[in-house]
UniProtKB/Swiss-Prot annotation:
Main location: membrane
A Pfam family this chain is assigned to: YidD
Region of interest (Disordered), residue spans: 61-80
Compartment(s) of residence: Cell membrane
This protein's name: Putative membrane protein insertion efficiency factor
Keyword Ribonucleoprotein: no
Organism the protein comes from: Streptococcus pneumoniae (strain 70585)
C-alpha cells in the first residue's frame, strides 16, 4: 500500500521537479517529507504531506520541519 502511495511522488521527483527551479522553503523538501510521512504514518502521511505543501509558500518560515513521530497536520515544533 505504501509503495502505491509513494509512486506518484517518485514520478514527480523524477520527471516534473527537474523541469522547475528548486522552490521548497524547507530543509527536507516537500516531496521527501511526504515520502517519509507515508513511510511512518501510511495514508495519514499523504494528508501530512499535503498540509506541508500548503505551508510551503513565500511568506512561511523556512528551515527544518521533520516528520513528527505522531500524526499531526501542524508544523513540527522542533522545526521552529
Amino acid at each position: 500500500m505504501k509503495r502505491i502511495l509513494i509512486a506518484p511522488v517518485r514520478f514527480y521527483q523524477r520527471f516534473i521537479s527537474p523541469v522547475f527551479p528548486p522552490s521548497c522553503r524547507f530543509d527536507l523538501t516537500c516531496s521527501n517529507y511526504m515520502i517519509q510521512a507515508i513511510e511512518k504514518h501510511g495514508f495519514k502521511g499523504v494528508l501530512m504531506g499535503l498540509a506541508r505543501i500548503l505551508r510551503c509558500h513565500p511568506w512561511s518560515k523556512t528551515g527544518k520541519d521533520p516528520v513528527p513521530d505522531h500524526f499531526s497536520l501542524k508544523r513540527n515544533q522542533e522545526g521552529e
